């Protein structure tokens, strides 16, 4: 699979959300994403345009290779949340940390704006790639990432969901 997003960057052009790449694919001093892992203070990074992806898919097809895109969700979304903080509930007072030491890197799939965003992004990606599946990660979500979320607590009560794991399963089955 082709890992196109993670905590560190957003590497695929989504036409409906251009800030994902203009702000989320570069890091450096005075950038939305600060320098990581020795990348230095100069602006560094980049992304794949949809035309470049189509070209790569076409080339891979000639070699009998299929490409499965991966958009890492609901965790591993630190960069996404720097660009679109509204995808995480502001009233949540929990500070969660993942295995890579990124704090608060999990989107809130119970929010309508998050559902709309996911629908838009996954539709653009499914129109772009010929592979029948999109890998959405679902790994390494910090255990307490949704504990303080009033909207998730409310959603879980309304839908008789008893744990964050069950909520994640529900989310996965409905995106």
PLM features: what roles do these ranges have?
Residues 1-4, 110, 167-170, 174:
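Proteins with a high burden of low-complexity, intrinsically disordered sequence enriched in S/T/G/P/A and R
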Residues 119-175:
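Gly/Pro-rich turn-and-neighbor structural signature
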Residues 66-70, 85, 115, 122-126:
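Helix-rich catalytic cores of soluble enzyme domains
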